[in-house]
């Protein structure tokens, strides 16, 4: 039976789709951007475009690091991975969670384009399309062994290092079922993780369908109807390593393995598609009311003492890029972003 609550969710879904359509269809090229890169959903890309993106990621994994003094880093991809390990405690469950990751993914996109000749934009994985279906998430095109990122881990093909402190490293042992068995990254060696460990190991996964409830269109609609940035951010992000999962944690745990880890999740290239979709949901929320474009709030750290996050709060990207204030990344139609979602 179609309930009143179902009707509300349906209306919210219609509203969010209309807002996202407006992002491209009714907006002229913004001042300051020569053009807008169009971030598209993975399954809408032609096979050749998917392979171009995968090859660009593999290129980044083969380029030497810009900072030769960075411990264990052997590639530009490693440099991005290492920064997340360093900053994770500061950029999760805080007000800067969304703007920090927006800038982080943008820098990754820039590296793919400027250093590896990639002509497109960073794609996103609209996991709500997979969560809404009756099929397993493992059937998503992002897990295709040829035109995707490979599938599941093989049981028993990976073991955590002896004496690993799973609490300090926020590791869920059940998520690390084994090494990815197919696809373009099955033989790639990660230098960082799990957690804050520095160890050479394979890319691991344990794809789980029980996370679908946090990734469906209903969850997205419920988040975007919240009135304040802080309420929206909490509903989208959730709390790490607790039963209170939301879209952010649901995507990480749905993939499992390295992606499930609070610190080392960017070791899985799917991280950047997952966070592009989270950024897209934030963009939906921003566009619903004019005052939301520059609305920011929240604490600067999980534990006191902390300050309130404001538009002037610095986004520290370590050796990847200059530190800039949050206000500079709030509008994706302005530099340094200059992209949109289609």
Predicted regions and their residues:
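Fungal secretory targeting signals
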Residues: 1-23
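Intrinsically disordered, flexible peripheral segments
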Residues: 20-342
């Amino acid at each position: 039976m179609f309930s009143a609550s179902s009707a509300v969710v349906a209306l919210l879904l219609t509203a969010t789709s209309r807002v996202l359509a407006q992002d491209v269809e009714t907006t002229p090229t913004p001042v300051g951007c020569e053009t807008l890169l169009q971030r598209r959903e993975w399954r809408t890309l032609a096979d050749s475009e998917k392979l171009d993106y995968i090859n660009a990621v593999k290129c980044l994994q083969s380029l030497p690091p810009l900072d030769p003094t960075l411990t264990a880093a052997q590639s530009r991809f490693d440099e991005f991975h290492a920064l997340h390990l360093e900053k994770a405690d500061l950029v999760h469950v805080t007000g800067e969670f969304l703007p920090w990751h927006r800038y982080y993914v943008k820098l990754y996109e820039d590296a793919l384009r400027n250093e590896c000749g990639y002509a497109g934009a960073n794609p996103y994985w609209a996991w709500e399309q997979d969560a809404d279906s009756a099929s397993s998430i493992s059937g998503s095109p992002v897990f295709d062994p040829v035109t995707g990122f490979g599938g599941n881990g093989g049981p028993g093909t990976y073991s955590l290092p002896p004496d690993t402190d799973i609490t300090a490293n926020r590791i869920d042992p059940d998520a690390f079922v084994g090494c990815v068995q197919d696809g373009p990254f099955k033989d790639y060696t990660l230098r960082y993780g799990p957690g804050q460990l520095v160890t050479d190991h394979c890319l691991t996964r344990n794809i789980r369908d029980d996370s679908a409830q946090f990734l469906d269109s209903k969850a997205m609609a419920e988040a975007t109807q919240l009135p304040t940035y802080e309420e929206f951010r909490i509903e989208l992000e959730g709390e790490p390593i607790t039963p209170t999962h939301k879209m952010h944690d649901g995507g990480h745990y749905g993939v499992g393995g390295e992606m499930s880890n609070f610190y080392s999740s960017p070791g899985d290239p799917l991280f950047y598609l997952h966070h592009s979709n989270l950024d897209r949901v934030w963009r939906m929320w921003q566009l619903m009311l004019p005052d939301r474009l520059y609305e920011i709030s929240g604490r600067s750290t999980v534990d006191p003492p902390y300050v309130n996050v404001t538009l002037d709060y610095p986004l520290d990207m370590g050796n990847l890029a200059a530190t800039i204030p949050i206000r500079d990344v709030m509008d994706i139609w302005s530099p340094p972003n200059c992209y949109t979602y289609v």
